[in-house]
A protein has these predicted regions:
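Non-catalytic cell-wall polysaccharide-engagement segments
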Residues: 2-77, 94-95, 112-185
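A general structural signal for well-ordered alpha-helical packing
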Residues: 65, 84-85
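Extracytoplasmic
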Residues: 79-83, 101-104
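Structural recognition of the beta-strand scaffold that forms the well-ordered cores
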Residues: 86, 106-108, 156-158
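Conserved alpha-helical segments that form or flank metal/cofactor-binding pockets of metalloenzymes
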Residues: 88-101
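Glycine-rich, phosphate-binding/catalytic loops in enzymes
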Residues: 103-106, 177
């Protein structure tokens, strides 16, 4: 009886892992192999649409903000940039060493998913505590979620927070509320 339960449990875990892999956004064929290579895409050509922000008087780290913007431009979702600023503020207050239970780093990635997400995003072996790796994986995930949600920001935010088939009015409300506190620097 226990043997059967173990087999069923292993099957369920395998199924969930397969489904999680299918639900993640697909990566571009030309994904960089290291985070350092992603900085090569950061170009001064992007500066025309870039805005340096603060939230409620807290100035954000310029280098991280610029890097995030360039990653979103590379993925064709630069319009999402102000929302991304607010979402990361909601997640960690832009603190790269933030920890909340099983969530770590700037974008509060779950440790159990990090290795797979980083590899799928094109940066296998990336350190979960590296803010540039966090921003790279975050922008990869959000561009996929935005595509899957047909550009619906609330749906994409919920997908990031709870998973593909979930919705959270509370989380979306918190992120959207920070939009009122964005200040141009």
């Amino acid at each position: 009886m226990i043997y059967r339960l173990l087999i069923i449990l292993l099957y369920i875990i395998s199924y969930i892992a397969d489904m999680a892999g299918q639900m993640m956004p697909q990566i571009a064929e030309t994904a960089p192999q290291t985070v350092e290579q992603t900085t090569e895409s950061v170009s001064s050509d992007y500066s025309r649409g870039f805005t340096h922000y603060a939230i409620a008087g807290n100035v954000l780290p310029y280098e991280w903000e610029w890097y995030l913007y360039c990653q979103l431009v590379d993925r064709g979702v630069e319009w999402f940039y102000p929302y991304a600023i607010c979402q990361i503020w909601q997640e960690s207050r832009w603190n790269a060493s933030s920890t909340n239970g099983k969530d770590h780093g700037l974008c509060q990635q779950k440790g159990i998913y990090w290795d797979g997400r980083a590899a799928n995003a094109g940066i296998p072996g990336a350190d979960i505590w590296d803010p540039y790796a966090q921003l790279y994986v975050y922008s990869w995930m959000m561009s996929g979620y935005l595509a899957a949600a047909g550009g619906n920001v609330g749906r994409a935010l919920s997908m990031y927070y709870l998973g593909v088939d979930a919705w959270s009015d509370e989380y979306v409300g918190h992120v959207m509320a920070w939009m009122d506190y964005l200040e141009v620097r």
